Amino acid sequence: MARALLPLLLLSLGCLYGGLAQAGEPAPLVPPDYWQNGDWQGMPDSTQVDKQRVLFARHDGDSYLGLAILLPDWQRSGQLWQLTRDLGRLGFDTLLLLPSPQQTELDPAAEKKQQAIDDFRKQFATRISKLGDAKLQEGGFRLLLAQGTSAAWAANLIASEQLPAPDALVLLDGFFPNQQSNQTLAKQVAQASVPTLDLYQEEGSTWPLLAAEARKSESRRSHKLNYRPYALMDLDETPGRIQGWLTHLGWI
């Protein structure tokens, strides 16, 4: 009986693979951020702006201060979104742009990947500008709060004028996984005119700590105005540090 079934089984497999071969096209690859978009699709604050999945929350009360654009590191969206309630109390609408896996894979110093880097920079800058413009109300401040590699790329884009400078910039554990790129980033941050709050976790990972130290040293050397570095004992300190800094800037 088994011998009789074997030819039928082989014939069936041959038809299956023959059909696939005739199709001549492989199954389309799932985009790297496909599952991320699916994870956030059902959230109450999830919406679409310009056909892109974002998280958006309006400010509390009648006092509107501006728009806080949140740029989380890869797989850190939930962590950064926790700041929404505190920012809303200050009068900020909050807009979170879901990160791209490319931001952790690409390095500005990698000459062999320059085309991919240029394409990513252009796409990232366009997303930030376009989605931010769609949600910013007239007369409000634009606050850019970026984390990890998103922070490094955002500061890099602002310095190269590919991204219009916000009214203020908050970096949270900003870094590239390359010392040369971090040194270049430190000079760019020091030379930029945008007011910058540079937050980093005191017990954080090696790359963010090295990158933060480079920015502090370069900003002191350049006598950068409106630059404030601060070591966080805990991420829960972040809202209070942002509020104190905005008070210093005269926003609240």
Per-segment meaning from a language model:
Residues 168-234:
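The feature captures the conserved acid-bearing segment of alpha/beta-hydrolase catalytic domains
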Residues 133-191:
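Primarily recognizes the serine-hydrolase "nucleophile elbow" in alpha/beta-hydrolase
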